[in-house]
Amino acid sequence: MKPSKPFVMPPVRIIPPTLEGQSESSKSLEEWLNTEETVRDLHFGKRTEEHMEYSYKSITNCTFSHIQFSACKLKSCHFTDVRFEHCDLSNISFAESSLFRVEFISCKLVGTNLPETILNHLTMKDCNARYLNL
């Protein structure tokens, strides 16, 4: 009797975000979230977002480049097709949120809180994620 080959799971294919038709935002993310339930199709660049605390908001088809998030809490928020590039998300809280097709590229994620957060098709490339809380 020949020994059987061990079962090997095929690699999981992670789907990248679909980022299309984005406009450069003239307002901060906080200004958008103060007036909108859903923020979509925007590119945010080089700014600081401080002391934001929002719940039950949606962010769709957005890119964040060189953004520093300081003392921010985004509870039960939904992120779909979002890319963070060269951002500092240290100690930000995404508690009870869902992240679907989200990329973190060259980001600082030290102490980022993701308790009870749903992570689907999420990638982290060249990130510092020490003390990340899942």
Mark where each language-model region is.
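Tandem repeat scaffolds
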Residues: S4-V8, R13-L134
